């Protein structure tokens, strides 16, 4: 084995020389240089500085403007809540522990940090699935005369929390476990060991299939059908500039959604899957730490892609920030055209 396993940790460093120490008790500067831990802390600080204001502003602006409280925006707000979970439950902890060079909060703190970070990430992921299904049902119309209403939105939000808890809670009750990962300053699901005492192998397989592969398939299917439907509508109404514009906007949104989803989550999932399927292989702490950067950065991409590109929300945000004045001067008509509750071929 090229790593060192303890009762509640796995350090990706051989203890042949006797230098490995518990990541809950001692600085891990034998894994990486102190300046690298400082860089990790600086990155976490950047995510907090950017992630908290934009997600908090999303919630605040929606509360201030009644016209934003549409059914679909419930899901978008759920994304903001999920991102705030990641900011407060994960980023702040990692910032503090990185400054000390090890996970100073002990196994209990590791469980809490791992739970909240996983919960926030999974709420965001399943919110994207609900958004994809909503766009598919509204635009592609597999069910005629369907209108996405408040009850559907509430059910969608509840569904995201149920699925997120189904992923984040089991390690707290004996199915798998949370341990420090990468540079040992943040915690996540144990991909490093089989750990039969907690049936770790079955949980990791369950997590990859149910909480990554299936959501990815659903998202690709829904947006693939959406693009096809928009192209077909444009082909039948080639003289319609509005339809052609809608096609371009929806296509751009779809490309951004898929690309940033993959950027945020695929590297982390791919590395975790490699580590799990190559037990005992030689890899360094940076190997797992770098992909996690992309996953954590989703707290910034989500509000930018799913909310900031909406004209109505952007106008309301500017009005709130500028004390009732819209400095861009966009009129209400243009804002209304981009309402997320629309049932015609238009981007969310």
Swiss-Prot record:
What are the boundaries of the region Interaction with SAG?
330-348
N6-(retinylidene)lysine modified-residue sites:
296
Species this protein is from:
Cricetulus griseus (Chinese hamster)
**Gene Ontology CC terms:** membrane; photoreceptor disc membrane; photoreceptor inner segment membrane; photoreceptor outer segment membrane; plasma membrane
User: Which UniProt keyword terms apply here?
Assistant: Acetylation, Cell projection, Chromophore, Disulfide bond, G-protein coupled receptor, Glycoprotein, Lipoprotein, Membrane, Metal-binding, Palmitate, Phosphoprotein, Photoreceptor protein, Receptor, Retinal protein, Sensory transduction, Transducer, Transmembrane, Transmembrane helix, Vision, Zinc
Gene3D superfamilies (alphabetical): Rhodopsin 7-helix transmembrane proteins
- Which BP terms from GO are recorded? absorption of visible light; G protein-coupled opsin signaling pathway; visual perception
**Presence of the UniProt keyword Transmembrane in the record:** yes
- Provide the positions where the record notes the PTM Phosphothreonine: 336, 340, 342
One Gene Ontology MF term: G protein-coupled photoreceptor activity
Q: Which residues carry this modification: Phosphoserine?
A: 334, 338, 343
> Which cysteines in this chain are paired by disulphide bridges?
110-187
Q: Which PROSITE patterns match?
A: G_PROTEIN_RECEP_F1_1 (PS00237), G_PROTEIN_RECEP_F1_2 (PS50262), OPSIN (PS00238)
**Topological domains, Cytoplasmic:** 62-73, 134-152, 225-252, 309-348
What gene does the UniProt entry assign to this protein? RHO
What protein name applies here? Rhodopsin
Which residues bear the site annotation Plays an important role in the conformation switch to the active conformation?
A: 113
Q: State the coiled-coil residue ranges.
A: none
């Amino acid at each position: 084995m090229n790593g060192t396993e303890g009762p509640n940790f796995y350090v990706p460093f051989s203890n042949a020389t006797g230098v490995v120490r518990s990541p809950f008790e001692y600085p891990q500067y034998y894994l990486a240089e102190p300046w690298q831990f400082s860089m990790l802390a600086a990155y976490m600080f950047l995510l907090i500085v950017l992630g908290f204001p934009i997600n908090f502003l999303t919630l605040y602006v929606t509360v201030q403007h009644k016209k934003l409280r549409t059914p679909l925006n419930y899901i978008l707000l759920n994304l903001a809540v999920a991102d705030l979970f990641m900011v407060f439950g994960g980023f702040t902890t990692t910032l503090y522990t990185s400054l000390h060079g090890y996970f100073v909060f002990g196994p209990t703190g590791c469980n809490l940090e791992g739970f909240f970070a996983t919960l926030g990430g999974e709420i965001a992921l399943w919110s994207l699935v609900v958004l994809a299904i909503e766009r598919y049902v509204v635009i592609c119309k597999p069910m005629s005369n369907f209108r996405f209403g408040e009850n559907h939105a509430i059910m969608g939000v509840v569904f995201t929390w149920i699925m997120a808890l189904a992923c984040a809670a089991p390690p707290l009750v004996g199915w798998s476990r949370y341990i420090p990962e990468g540079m040992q300053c943040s915690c996540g699901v144990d991909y490093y060991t089989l750990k039969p005492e907690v049936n770790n192998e079955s949980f990791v397989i369950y997590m990859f299939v149910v909480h990554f592969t299936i959501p990815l398939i659903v998202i690709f299917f829904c947006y693939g059908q959406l693009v096809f439907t928009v192209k077909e509508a444009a082909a039948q109404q080639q003289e319609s500039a509005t339809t052609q514009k809608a096609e371009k906007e929806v296509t751009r949104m779809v490309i951004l959604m898929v690309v940033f989803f993959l950027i945020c989550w695929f590297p982390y999932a791919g590395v975790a899957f490699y580590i799990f399927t190559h037990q005992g292989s030689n890899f360094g702490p940076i190997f797992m730490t770098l992909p996690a950067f992309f996953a954590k950065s989703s707290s910034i991409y989500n509000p930018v892609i799913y909310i900031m590109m909406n004209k109505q929300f952007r106008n309301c945000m500017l009005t709130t920030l500028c004390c009732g004045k819209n400095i861009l001067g966009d009129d209400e008509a243009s804002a209304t055209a981009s309402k997320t509750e629309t049932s015609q071929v238009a981007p969310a």
